[in-house]
Amino acid sequence: MAQEVFQRTKPHVNIGTIGHVDHGKTTLTAAITMTLAVNSTCTPKKYDEIDAAPEERARGITINTAHVEYETALRHYAHVDCPGHADYIKNMITGAAQMDGAILVVSAADGPMPQTKEHILLAKQVGVPSIVVFLNKEDQVDDEEILQLVDLEVRESLINYEFPGDKVPVVSGSALMALQALTEKPNTSRGENKWVDKIYELMDAVDSYIPTPKRDIEKPFLMPIEDVFSIQGRGTVATGRIERGILKLGDIVELIGLNEKIRSTVVTGLEMFRRLLEQGFAGENIGVLLRGIEKKDIERGMVIAQPGTIEPHTRFEAQVYILRKEEGGRHSPFFAGYRPQFFVRTADVTGVIEAFEYDNGDKTRMVMPGDRVKMIVNLICPIAIEKKMRFAIREGGRTIGAGVVYKY
C-alpha cells in the first residue's frame, strides 16, 4: 500500500460525470484533472488512464466507474466517471449512489439523448442532490441559437425529473479543445486559453452550486464493499465509500452479507488515493487492509461494519413505489412470485416478492405501474439490512421501483 500520508485541509466532496455515451464524459474528466493540476498537488490524468480497463478501451466505452481526485482552491474532490453505455447502468447505480453532486455532460452538437434522460432519472432515484450541466463540443456548433435551444432542452429535461432546471448552472465549452491546449502547454493558467477557462468556469459552478454535504460521523461505522483485491505479502484490501461513522487503524470490524456467517477481522491498513490514513471518515472513498481475510472470503455487496450494529437477513417488508411507464418503469402489472433484482447499496440480489397490500391494508393480487404498496420480499441470499434502508428494484436493464425497508 502507499507510503505518503493523506493531509485533510479542505472539505471532501464526491462528484461524478453522467450523460449519454460519447458525449465526452471521460474527456471532460481528463480535462478537469489537467486544468486543476496546474495549481495543486494532484496528478493530471490522461483520457487513457481514466478509461483504463481493457474491455473499455477496446470498445471506447467506459465500463467500470473510474475514480480520480483533484482539488480546487476551496475543496478536495473524488470524481467518479460513470458509464454511459446502457448495459452498464448497474455500475452507475452503485457509483451514483455515492455522489454528492453530478456534472451532466451533454453534447451541444446533439442535444439531450435517451441516455441523458435515463441518467437524470437515475440520479433522481439514487438521490444525487445537485446537478451542474456542461454543454460539451461547443467548438462544433456555429450557431448561437442552437446552443440556446440545447440549453433550454436540457433545463426542461431536468425539470421533468424534479431538478430545479431553471436554477441549475449551465456552462458550455469543449473538453477536447481544453485537453489539446493542456497537452501542448501543461501549465496553462487561467486567462491564457478560452477553452481551459471554460473548465475553470465549470469548476467554479461546481464549487458554488453543489453544497458541501454534512457527513454522518456520529453513527456506528459502516462501509459497503465495492471492490476487492489482494496485495502480495500484505493481505486483502476492500474498497468502498464510508456510508457513516469513522474507521481507525486497529479497529475490529465485521464482514456481513451474501452468506449467513459473520466474520470478524482487524483493520491493519487504510489508504485513500494511494496515500496512508490514520482514520477514514464518512463520505470518503478508501481502501481497507484486513487481517487474515482471503480474497475468496469477501466480495462486492458485503458490508464492513462496527461489530453488533447490523445483521444479514433474507426476508424483509418494505414500502415501495412502482414506477410508471412514463418514468421509465414497467408497462404492465406484476403478481406475487415476481422475481426481479434488488439493488441494496453495492449488493445486487434476486428476490421473490411474496405478497403485497396497499397502504390502507387492502390486499391486492397484482401491482400496477404507479402503485404505492407494502411488500414482503425473500432474497436468495442474505444481505446487511436495517430499517429505513433504501433500495432499487430492477428488471431487464431498467429500474422498475424504489423502496424503503420498514421491518425484517
From Swiss-Prot:
Residues 60-64 are annotated as: G2. GO terms for biological process: mitochondrial translational elongation. Residues 174-176 are annotated as: G5. Its EC number is 3.6.5.3. It comes from the Eukaryota. The keyword Plastid applies. GO terms for cellular component: chloroplast; mitochondrion. Residues 136-139 are annotated as: G4. The keyword Protein biosynthesis applies. It is found in: Plastid, Chloroplast. Residues 19-26 are annotated as: G1. InterPro entries: EF-Tu_GTP-bd, EF-Tu_GTPase, EFTu-like_2, EFTU_2, G_TR_CS, P-loop_NTPase, Small_GTP-bd, T_Tr_GTP-bd_dom. GTP binds at residues 19-26, 81-85, 136-139. Residues 81-84 are annotated as: G3. Keywords: Chloroplast, Elongation factor, GTP-binding, Hydrolase, Magnesium, Metal-binding, Nucleotide-binding, Plastid, Protein biosynthesis. Disulfide bonds: none annotated. Mg(2+) binds at T26. CDD domains: EF_Tu, EFTU_II, EFTU_III. GTP hydrolase that promotes the GTP-dependent binding of aminoacyl-tRNA to the A-site of ribosomes during protein biosynthesis. This is Elongation factor Tu, chloroplastic. It comes from Chara connivens. The gene is tufA.
